[in-house]
Amino acid sequence: MNRAGILLEKEPGLKTIFQGSEHSYVRCVIADMADPERHFVCRVLDEEDLPVAVGEPITLEVIKVVTERRSGIVRFDCRLIKKPE
């Protein structure tokens, strides 16, 4: 499954444990292309920073969906789909 949208914010240089090993990631929020009022919170794994500026389109491959029980917030663990040069 892919998520495409406009990058609203990003927080680079973070670290997490994912599937038993440490990974760098970028926390970001994207606005859905079809419905810009819908925002998605994503962790883009294995990236120190994104080569996409805030306000530009981005496409991510979702590898895991996580729902935080207490808050009910859904977060997507993703990988960046790189554009061919």
Name each model-derived stretch:
Residues G5-E9, G55-V65:
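OB-fold and OB-like beta-barrel modules that bind single-stranded nucleic acids
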Residues N2, Y25-R27, P57:
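Broad gene-expression machinery/nucleic-acid interaction feature
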Residues S24-V29, G72-F76:
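Short beta-strand micro-motifs in enzyme catalytic cores
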Residues N2-A4, H39-V41, D77:
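Well-ordered beta-strand positions in beta-sheet-rich domains
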Residues I63-E85:
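OB-fold/S1-family single-stranded nucleic acid-binding modules
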Residues V29-V52:
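Beta-strand/loop nucleic-acid-binding surfaces
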Residues M1-E22:
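Structural detector for short beta-strands of small beta-barrel domains
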Residues A31, L45, E61-I63, I81:
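A structural detector for beta-sheet-dominated domains
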